């Protein structure tokens, strides 16, 4: 029903399959009023819409027509349709005269594609007692709806809505309980008041505590989120669908949506974008029009800008630049920036879903970039890597640092008691933003060279660097810090090492590839992969390492774009022999064994388990339940997703081990 096609952070480009067609996500569902609709939303990019089943049910004429001709003909939309159950009316008026079972039955009758149970929308900041009471009713109705749908063999997909007000633990509880029901989609409800009051920080807590406890294999719908300025942040948190009545409600009030906020027509001197409406009309033109015509044109603009933003977000996911877009969008309003900073508190969760390598470089746009998955991941790996006795800290230079390191390095100040140099027992690292300390032996692997940051460090960068140094100097007997670093950070060291002139970085390709293997596959992988008569072949054009052999037997290729090691059959055998189960492994069932041996790609439904540290784009070993090596390939999903999905590819197999 749902497959992931591309990933970045928790954002994903996916395909939602329904009885009325497929929908690419992230996507927006314009709200269609069954009586008042004046705009053909499909013309402006709508692949899926949402309408209110309760409003149709309450209108005898509409109810009769919908039962006779079906919902699609009633609202003149042949694509997928989601229906709400009347929960919004329940939240506004306090009651609706329809039961949960009746509204499920009616949605099936009118042939909606995705129906919704009658949940209780609990407003933000209510008492805990009310939130808990409402939640129990929501859970009871969700279970009733799923059971009834299944018992009646209904065709429609079913939403189960996550409630819990602004209590993170109640959101988690609700998500956990709904997951057990195995619904088809999971809306996150009662968030409109948070967005209307610019409580975006609280929105982050609500969404993250919901999404983290929902199945990765099902789409999530952020209910009522219709303003394009919030889309990028919401997608980065794992939301796949949005619905919007804002496009028409704002137009009724002469307000134009944009990714920077909302413009009032009365204040506009220039049109805010390059859509068809903005190119063909001036603010004065719109102000001079009859109300209805003006409303429809502004609504068209609002749809245009909303769908344009979603196209941009999907493209950012494809190229791996989603977080750069999020950081840009969240500077449109101080409360959004606060929300972005709050999202940094969830970096450990986000890291599980972020691919190891991306098509785009990492751009540092501010202190918030320091909390991104790539930075956290590097720090974790650096802490786990083996260390030598001494550490030399160098200032940043042109990238890759190891290629341009000078033969004469300059003066070095000593942290701790001075000892005689032992360059064979010394780690050389560059100090730079945003990754802190970068060992020269691994500096070409993504994203340690594939990043850009301002040469002028901001206060947050300086604090980050100082904390980094404070931690890592304690791991070494002697730390030698370059004079330029001392000056830049105003470090109070005054003793220049007596052998400063003798400090040299000796490039060693074998040590380099071993260090990269340890960084990529885990400590010990380098020695296991590169034992024997190792020969390293470089590109004549670029000088980069391309192939590594034991004699004439290929072990790995090094990918030029990110310096990741790509296993050959021999490399896979060596890594498998040297690592403990389930490290670097994806375990498939017996049905998949013969196909894996032949080099066929692995589908998620055949996976029994996998290493929990696997991330999308990782090179992995494919084994059976007895740990026999069957094949090797590239993970398309992270471990959490591989274990949860029952559809779609999990591993793109490079080669099977069949003789």
UniProtKB/Swiss-Prot annotation:
Enzymatic reactions: guanosine(15) in tRNA + 7-cyano-7-deazaguanine = 7-cyano-7-carbaguanosine(15) in tRNA + guanine
Transmembrane annotation, as ranges: none
Cofactor binding, per record: Binds 1 zinc ion per subunit.
Enzyme Commission number, as recorded: 2.4.2.48
Domain of life: Archaea
Active site (catalytic residues): 84
Positions contributing to substrate binding: 119, 190
GO CC field: cytoplasm
GO biological process: tRNA wobble guanine modification
Occurrences of domain PUA (ranges): 583-658
Metabolic or biological pathway: tRNA modification; archaeosine-tRNA biosynthesis
Binding site for Zn(2+): 273, 275, 278
Signal peptide coordinates: none
Family: Belongs to the archaeosine tRNA-ribosyltransferase family.
Protein name: tRNA-guanine(15) transglycosylase
Organism, as annotated: Methanobrevibacter smithii (strain ATCC 35061 / DSM 861 / OCM 144 / PS)
